[in-house]
From Swiss-Prot:
This is Tryptophan synthase beta chain. It holds the Pfam family PALP. Pathway: Amino-acid biosynthesis; L-tryptophan biosynthesis; L-tryptophan from chorismate: step 5/5. InterPro entries: Trp_synth_b_CS, Trp_synth_beta, Trp_synth_beta/beta-like, TrpB-like_PALP, TrpB-like_PALP_sf. The modification N6-(pyridoxal phosphate)lysine is found at K99. It comes from Pseudomonas fluorescens (strain Pf0-1). GO terms for cellular component: cytoplasm. SUPFAM superfamilies: Tryptophan synthase beta subunit-like PLP-dependent enzymes. The gene is trpB.
């Protein structure tokens, strides 16, 4: 299998206007445009600053605990009876997910820009926890917007955020999920542009956020290249990751986009099934439109109104997807599939029993796709799955589903 070529066309985006093909851009209120342009300038300067890079590397290593292990899942591999399965163990990071990679990068940028107040949106609560964590570490005020539906199903994370000193503001609008939390955070930002830094948690939002979040998450894929090279002496044959907004996936995928031999698979949340309309699969069941400052694939009705997304996993419950994913779907470089709630739950249980690892329900969607594909593949096929987070936060949800299914059987 060939190593990366010098041709990095697919990794060069976005263009100066923040576009990946026809996706992305900057669709923001006039009051925000100067701030967005300033943020883009500051980020470009930080990327070239050796002191910034050195400080980021220090915190990734000594605070986050990187590199995260690339673990050969021997029992999952035996169970599937085909491809050799490796897990990229992002759940072992400080705070229990990949989210901290991006938060450390952005908090250093916020400090560089002299901002004293941090705001963020959160769905599953993991980005909220990671944001509250870095705000505490750097002594900055922190406000987290979270939908009431998500607050109900992620109470442990709400408590963790408060413990870390953040103010958690419940959002009752809409379905009380991630989309609504992001709407409120954007409103706050417009009102408090001078003092406030909006720490977006995924590869969405107006430019430069999709590229910036991707760059901070790309440490996942860079480490995976080196680790698999050390363990197997070659590149993976396929990569698999779950997708909500898509930051954990983009972090794994981006360093491999120009390696044509590497098959890349993104897994959306099919909820109750795409055909039911109760899902969060923007690429498999959506159309292009504009939301939260960028053009991408969205779940919307014939009038262009955003349709409520559904997933058992709070972190995948978003009616859009990062614009770079939309572009990669459009050009056919990445395959985007989907997995139902039930399939994800089954994979969650298998991973617990076979590997002694409790994955997040988000990551369980990626595992479910692996369970479909791995048995059909040869034993020398190397498959890397991004285990994006741990499942502690999902105990209530899983218990509820186990109790419900017991009742249905009786």
């Amino acid at each position: 299998m060939t190593q990366t070529s010098n041709n990095s066309d697919l990794r060069n985006g976005p263009d100066a206007n923040g576009l990946f093909g026809s996706f992305g851009g900057r669709y923001v209120a006039e009051t925000l445009m100067p701030l967005i342009l300033d943020l883009a300038r500051e980020y470009e300067a930080a990327k070239e600053d050796p002191a910034f890079k050195e400080e980021l590397a220090y915190f990734q290593r000594d605070y986050v605990g990187r590199p995260s292990p690339l673990y050969f899942a021997e029992r999952l591999t035996e169970f599937c009876g085909g491809a050799k399965i490796y897990l990229k163990r992002e759940e072992l990071n400080h705070t229990g997910a990949h989210k901290i990679n991006n938060c450390i990068g952005q908090i250093l940028l916020a400090r560089r820009m002299g901002k004293k107040r941090i705001i963020a949106e959160t769905g599953a609560g993991m980005h909220g926890v990671a944001t509250a964590t870095v705000a505490a570490r750097f002594g900055l005020d922190c406000v987290i917007y979270m939908g009431t539906t998500d607050i109900e199903r992620q109470q442990a994370n709400v408590f963790r955020m408060k413990l870390l000193g953040a103010e958690v503001i419940p959002v009752v609008a809409g379905t009380g999920t991630l989309k609504d939390a992001m709407n409120e955070a954007l409103r706050d930002w417009v009102t408090n542009v001078d003092s406030t830094f909006y720490l977006i948690g995924t590869v969405a939002g107006p430019h430069p956020y999709p590229a910036m979040v991707r760059d901070f998450q790309a440490v996942i894929g860079k480490e995976t290249r080196d680790q698999l090279q050390a363990q197997e002496g070659r590149l993976p044959d396929s990569l698999v990751a779950c997708i909500g907004g898509g930051s954990n996936a983009m972090g794994l995928f981006h360093p491999f986009l120009d390696d044509k031999s590497v098959e890349i698979i993104g897994v959306e949340a099919a909820g109750y099934g795409i055909e039911t309309g109760k899902h969060a699969a923007s690429l498999n069941g959506g159309v292009p439109g504009v939301l939260h400052g960028n053009r991408t694939f969205l779940l919307q009705d014939d009038d262009g109104q955003i349709i409520d997304a559904h997933s058992i996993s709070a972190g995948l419950d978003y009616p859009g997807i990062g614009p770079e994913h939309a572009w990669l779907h459009d050009i056919g470089r990445v395959q985007y599939t989907s997995v139902t709630d039930d399939e994800a739950l089954a994979a969650f249980h298998q991973c617990c029993r076979l590997e002694g690892i409790i994955p997040a329900l988000e990551s369980a969607h990626a595992l479910a796709e692996v369970f479909k594909r791995a048995p059909k593949l040869p034993k020398d096929h190397l498959m890397v799955v991004n285990l994006s987070g741990r499942g502690d936060k999902d105990m209530q949800t899983v218990m509820h589903h186990m109790e419900t299914s017991k009742q249905e059987k009786h």
